[in-house]
Amino acid sequence: MARFTSIVLVLSACFVSSRAQFGFFDQMFGNQGHQQHQEPQNVRSDSSWYQAQYEGAQCTHYLCPGTLSCVHFPHHCPCAWESVEDKAELGDGIAICGSKGGWKEGEFAKKVELARKGVL
């Protein structure tokens, strides 16, 4: 009887240790086969979300299409990524945004002006 108990203990110890090892491998290799976790969904590819945001925005002046900011004039629209973009006004009531690219302050506007003159 003591021998039977020790055999049962050894087998259960082997089972527990193998279960722990396979749990480690499941976790290490993406838990394939046991539990399925849901991936976050991508943003929809149609324009309905943007249109709903645009139509729901409250603005009594001009609503910037790129940032949904409410400003007095179209050329006052901010850049969408102000930390990495500079804005240059073209003088026709139009403003464009472009990458700062590591240039000095105002360098983007100078490059746009040179390109408009055909120098760059």
Curated annotation (Swiss-Prot):
Belongs to the LCL2 family. Residues 1-20 form the signal peptide. It comes from the Eukaryota. It comes from Phaeosphaeria nodorum (strain SN15 / ATCC MYA-4574 / FGSC 10173). Keywords: Signal. Probable component of the endoplasmic reticulum-associated degradation (ERAD) pathway. The keyword Signal applies. PANTHER family: LONG CHRONOLOGICAL LIFESPAN PROTEIN 2. InterPro entries: LCL2. This is Long chronological lifespan protein 2.
